[in-house]
C-alpha cells in the first residue's frame, strides 16, 4: 500500500479547515470504493496562527485517530470552540487517513511551512494544498492516476482564469511570470499553483536545496523533473480572508526574481557603464563647443535634473545590490527555517 502525504500550510484558517477536511475525506471515501491501494497522511502546518486554527487541527487529528483506534475516545481538544467543533464533527473520516499537526512558535511564512511539511512527510507521493479549497481535492484522484500510469515525476496545477481576483492584481501577476521566465533559469508557469503531487525523488531534491530564502515555484521549476500540468477554473476561497496583500505579493515577486536571477545586478552594472560613457561624451561635447563657438554652458535647471537623474539611478542600483547582499547575509547566518512549539509527531525536529 502506497502512502500519500498531503501538506496543508495554515495561517488563521480555523473557519476553512473543517470544510477542507470534510471535502478531502469525501474524495478519499469515494476513492476507497474503487481501490484500497493508498493510505493518506495529512500534515497540517500551523504557521503561528492567532485564531483557533491550532485547536481545530488538534480536533481533526483526534477524530482521525479515533477512526484508527476507536478505544482511544476522549474529550475533543476543541470542545470549547463550539462552531468549529460542530463543523469538524460533521466530517466523516475514512480509516486510511491520518491527520497530524505541526505548530510553529511564530509566523515564519508559507515557504517555511511547506519546507516543514516536506521535511516530515513520509509518503511515497507528496502533495501541497491550500486549506481554503482554492486547490480542489477532487483533482487528487486524477493526479494520482497520472503518476501511477504515465512517465511523470510530478503532476502540477495551474489556473486558466483569475475570476474573482482584482484586475490590477491579475495584470501584475501575468507580467511577473513573463519577466521571471525571461531573466531566470527556472521555468515558472503562468497561473501555477503550489498544488502539485510529487514522487519521493522530487521531494528529496527539494529538501537538498536547503537555502533560507525560499521561492518554491522557482525551486519546482529549477530542479527540472518531468511534470504534467492540469488546468482548472479559478475557485474562490471557501471561508476566511486572503493573507496576501498587494505589497506582500510584490515583495514575494521581488524575492523570487532575486533568488533565481542575476539579471538585476547585470542591469545595474549596465546602467553604471552607460552613465559613465554618457558623462564623458557630454564633457567632450561641451568642451569642443566652448573651443569652437565660445558658447557658455548655461542652464542650471538642466544640470540639476541630470544630477537628480544620475543620483536616482545610483540609489536604484545600490538598492538592488543591497537586496542581494541582504539575501547573502541571511544565508550566512544559517538561522533555522522554523521552530516547532507543538506537534503530535513523536520524532519531529523542533528546530530546522
Residue ranges and their predicted role:
Residues 217-352:
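Hydrophobic helical membrane-anchoring modules
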Residues 54-74, 79-80, 84-120, 158:
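Conserved donor nucleotide-binding strand/loop of the catalytic core
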Residues 46-55, 133-134:
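A conserved acidic beta->alpha catalytic loop
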Residues 32-48, 102-103:
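Short beta-strand/loop segment that forms part of the nucleotide-sugar
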Residues 98-106, 110-120, 125, 137-219, ...:
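Acceptor/aglycone-binding surface of glycosyltransferases and processive sugar-polymer synthases
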Residues 3-5, 41:
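Cell-envelope/extracellular polymer assembly enzymes that use nucleotide-activated donors
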Residues 13-32:
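Short, well-formed alpha-helical segments that are part of the catalytic scaffolds
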Amino acid at each position: 500500500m502506497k502512502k500519500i502525504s498531503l501538506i496543508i500550510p495554515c495561517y488563521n484558517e480555523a473557519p476553512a479547515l473543517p470544510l477542507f477536511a470534510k471535502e478531502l475525506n469525501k474524495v478519499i471515501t469515494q476513492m476507497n470504493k474503487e481501490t484500497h491501494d493508498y493510505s493518506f497522511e495529512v500534515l497540517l502546518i500551523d504557521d503561528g496562527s492567532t485564531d483557533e486554527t491550532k485547536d481545530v487541527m488538534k480536533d481533526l487529528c483526534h477524530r482521525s485517530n479515533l477512526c484508527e483506534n476507536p478505544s482511544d475516545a476522549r474529550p475533543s481538544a476543541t470542545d470549547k470552540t463550539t462552531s468549529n467543533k460542530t463543523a469538524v464533527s460533521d466530517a466523516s473520516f475514512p480509516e486510511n487517513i491520518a491527520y497530524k499537526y505541526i505548530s510553529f512558535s511564530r509566523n515564519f511564512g508559507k515557504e517555511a511551512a511547506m519546507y516543514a511539511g516536506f521535511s516530515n512527510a513520509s509518503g511515497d507521493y507528496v502533495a501541497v494544498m491550500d486549506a481554503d479549497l482554492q486547490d480542489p481535492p477532487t483533482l487528487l484522484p486524477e493526479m494520482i492516476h497520472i503518476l501511477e500510469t504515465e512517465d511523470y515525476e510530478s503532476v502540477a496545477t495551474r489556473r486558466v482564469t483569475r475570476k474573482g481576483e482584482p484586475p490590477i492584481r491579475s495584470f501584475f501577476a501575468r507580467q511577473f511570470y513573463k519577466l521571471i521566465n525571461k531573466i531566470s533559469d527556472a521555468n515558472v508557469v503562468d497561473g501555477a499553483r503550489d498544488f502539485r503531487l510529487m514522487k519521493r525523488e522530487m521531494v528529496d531534491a527539494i529538501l537538498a536545496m536547503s537555502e533560507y530564502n525560499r521561492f518554491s515555484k522557482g525551486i519546482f521549476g529549477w530542479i527540472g523533473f518531468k511534470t504534467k500540468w492540469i488546468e482548472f477554473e479559478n475557485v474562490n476561497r471557501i471561508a476566511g480572508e486572503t493573507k496576501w496583500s498587494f505589497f506582500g505579493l510584490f515583495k514575494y515577486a521581488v524575492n523570487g526574481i532575486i533568488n533565481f536571477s542575476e539579471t538585476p545586478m547585470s542591469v545595474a552594472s549596465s546602467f553604471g557603464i552607460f552613465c559613465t560613457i554618457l558623462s564623458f561624451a557630454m564633457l567632450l561635447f561641451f568642451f569642443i563647443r566652448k573651443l569652437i563657438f565660445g558658447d557658455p554652458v548655461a542652464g542650471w535647471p538642466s544640470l540639476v535634473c541630470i544630477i537628480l537623474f544620475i543620483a536616482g539611478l545610483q540609489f536604484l542600483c545600490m538598492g538592488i545590490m543591497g537586496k542581494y547582499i541582504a539575501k547573502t547575509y541571511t544565508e550566512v547566518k544559517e538561522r533555522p527555517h522554523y521552530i516547532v512549539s507543538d506537534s503530535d509527531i513523536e520524532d519531529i525536529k523542533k528546530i530546522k
